[in-house]
């Protein structure tokens, strides 16, 4: 086990592994911190990275089984202790590691008596067994068992199809999820006059990759989601004279807004891309809008006077305060 004393950076934002251990061949653990973060950022990152880790990291597993000795999934085979269903469940749990693409073939050819384990699977060169001792079946008599397998690399969870194929093959539930669990927690502290946060992230994997590798892949996936925004042409982000116009709906101070037009320099403002966090609103108004699920300037302007006054703790004079702030920051002329 590797464990380090916790030292928090006060300047540069950085990830750091503070604990790493191997509990078994199929259970790796890692604990990471990210700091320093502004208030609210830790929860944003924690939610996003957890979802990516649990749902979008690719894994490899057995997805299909075929054997002449299997009449149907809930049958038994003479000379084998486990039922066919139990064998399928054991094959489903086999942890594989690979860099393959598409679907690959594998097989088992075993003469009893004896125990069939993961090491008896004949694999393509691009696939490895993580734990050779994983149990598959106990052959109690001198019978010859031949099983053909399909191996696939994918992500998420896929439930087997209900129908069997005419060639005698059976789909099994596929769990392409090398990350077994993810927890995150947030520690708040004060640095000078500024409130900051530390994000603690715990990752458990099945041994086909380390928690550090999983975190790296999740971070890459998350970055790739935003790359189109970074490389898109400016025209895709800004309103043009005759395209993608936004009509300002009724607002608390609608009569004033009718006279004010969006500031037209070389670029027009894309209202959807302006978050209320950027407006430097008074804390009471900001919290009121957030609680009412108002996150962008467009969402703010999409509410009528009656709608806004229904928000808890929102007052008539708050509308004028918001308009004054928008004018000061030159969102309106």
UniProtKB/Swiss-Prot annotation:
Keywords: Chloroplast, DNA-directed RNA polymerase, Nucleotidyltransferase, Plastid, Transcription, Transferase. Pfam families: RNA_pol_A_bac (PF01000), RNA_pol_A_CTD (PF03118), RNA_pol_L (PF01193). Residues 1-233 are annotated as: Alpha N-terminal domain (alpha-NTD). It is found in: Plastid, Chloroplast. CDD domains: RNAP_alpha_NTD. It catalyses: RNA(n) + a ribonucleoside 5'-triphosphate = RNA(n+1) + diphosphate. GO terms for cellular component: chloroplast; DNA-directed RNA polymerase complex; mitochondrion. One of its GO terms (molecular function) is protein dimerization activity. GO terms for biological process: DNA-templated transcription. It comes from the Eukaryota. The keyword Transcription regulation does not apply. Disulfide bonds: none annotated. InterPro entries: DNA-dir_RNA_pol_insert (IPR011262), DNA-dir_RNA_pol_RpoA/D/Rpb3 (IPR011263), DNA-dir_RpoA (IPR011773), RBP11-like (IPR036603), RNAP_asu_C (IPR011260), RNApol_insert_sf (IPR036643). Its EC number is 2.7.7.6. Gene3D superfamilies: 5' to 3' exonuclease, C-terminal subdomain, DNA-directed RNA polymerase, insert domain, RNA polymerase, RBP11-like subunit. DNA-dependent RNA polymerase catalyzes the transcription of DNA into RNA using the four ribonucleoside triphosphates as substrates. NCBIfam families: rpoA (TIGR02027). In plastids the minimal PEP RNA polymerase catalytic core is composed of four subunits: alpha, beta, beta', and beta''. When a (nuclear-encoded) sigma factor is associated with the core the holoenzyme is formed, which can initiate transcription. The N-terminal domain is essential for RNAP assembly and basal transcription, whereas the C-terminal domain is involved in interaction with transcriptional regulators and with upstream promoter elements. This is DNA-directed RNA polymerase subunit alpha. It comes from Phaseolus vulgaris.
């Amino acid at each position: 086990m590797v464990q380090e004393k916790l030292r928090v950076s006060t300047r540069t934002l950085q990830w750091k592994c503070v604990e790493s251990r191997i509990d078994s061949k199929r259970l790796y653990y890692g604990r990471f911190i990210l700091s320093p973060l502004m208030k609210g950022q830790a929860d944003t990152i924690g939610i996003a990275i957890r979802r990516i880790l649990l749902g979008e990291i690719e894994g490899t597993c057995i997805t299909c089984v075929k054997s002449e000795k299997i009449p149907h999934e809930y049958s038994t085979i003479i000379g084998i202790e486990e039922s066919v269903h139990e064998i399928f469940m054991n094959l489903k749990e086999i942890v594989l590691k690979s860099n393959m693409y598409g679907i690959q073939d594998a097989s088992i050819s075993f003469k009893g008596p004896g125990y069939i384990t993961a090491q008896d699977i004949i694999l393509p060169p691009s696939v490895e067994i993580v734990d050779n001792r994983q149990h598959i079946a106990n052959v109690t008599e001198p019978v010859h068992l031949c099983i053909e397998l399909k191996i696939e690399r994918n992500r998420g969870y896929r439930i087997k199809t209900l129908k069997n194929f005419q060639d005698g093959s059976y789909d099994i539930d596929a769990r392409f999820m090398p990350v077994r669990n993810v927890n995150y927690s947030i520690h708040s502290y004060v640095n000078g006059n500024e409130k900051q946060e530390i994000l603690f992230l715990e990752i458990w994997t099945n041994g086909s990759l380390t928690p550090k590798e999983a975190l790296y892949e999740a971070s890459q996936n998350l970055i790739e989601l935003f790359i189109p925004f970074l490389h898109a042409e400016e025209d895709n982000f800004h309103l043009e004279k005759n395209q993608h116009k936004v009509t300002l709906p009724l607002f608390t101070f609608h009569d004033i807004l009718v006279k004010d037009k969006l500031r037209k320099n070389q670029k027009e403002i894309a209202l959807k891309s302006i978050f209320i966090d950027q407006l430097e609103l008074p804390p009471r108004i900001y919290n009121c809008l957030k609680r009412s699920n108002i996150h962008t300037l467009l969402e703010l302007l999409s509410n009528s006077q009656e709608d806004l006054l229904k928000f808890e703790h929102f007052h008539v004079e708050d509308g004028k305060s918001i308009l004054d702030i928008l004018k000061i920051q030159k969102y309106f002329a």
